[in-house]
Amino acid sequence: LLEKAILDRKEKTGKYPKAIIPVALYGMPYDCEKIMAIADKYGIPVIEDAAEGMGSRFNGQVLGTFGRFGVLSFNGNKMITTSGGGALICRNDEDANNVMWHATQARDAYPYYQHTEIGYNYRMSNVCAGIGRGQMTVLDDHIAHHKHVQSLYEELLKDIPGIHIHKQPADP
């Protein structure tokens, strides 16, 4: 279906998509190998939306680390929260430096404020970053708790017809 959509866009517009953005809803991994193979075939970068998939894995590899970029969210309803904000995973220093430069207002290295490009103010506060770093140390505990709650639901609802609990693809 993905490849069909790419070819359809190319036929209709003469252009390939600028990016492929797979989304890990409810911690459920997408098929990273298939998506990356198709993306590589057409030279399209992958930006993984792992906001709901933090800590989830596909064949042992953490979501957000397959594509050119991975995006995490630290909103209040996520596995780890800083009350807002997020993180960007970059595969190389050049991309990381470019993103940081734009996220910190694209200010040029002069003693006065000079901007040769439009930048943004997307920095997380030091306090929020500290909260996030502290919570990273207990990410595995949060994941284990969620799996425990899932197993409770499975046990309590197993005899009710029509109810199916989704399992992580990596789970047996």
Listing of model-derived features with the role each one plays in the protein:
Residues 1, 19-35, 44-73, 79:
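Conserved PLP phosphate-binding loop immediately N-terminal to the Schiff-base lysine helix
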Residues 3-15, 19-23, 28, 32-34, ...:
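PLP-dependent aminotransferase class I/II
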Residues 46, 83, 90-91, 115, ...:
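Solvent-exposed, non-transmembrane amphipathic alpha-helical segments
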Residues 65-103, 126-131:
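Active-site PLP attachment segment
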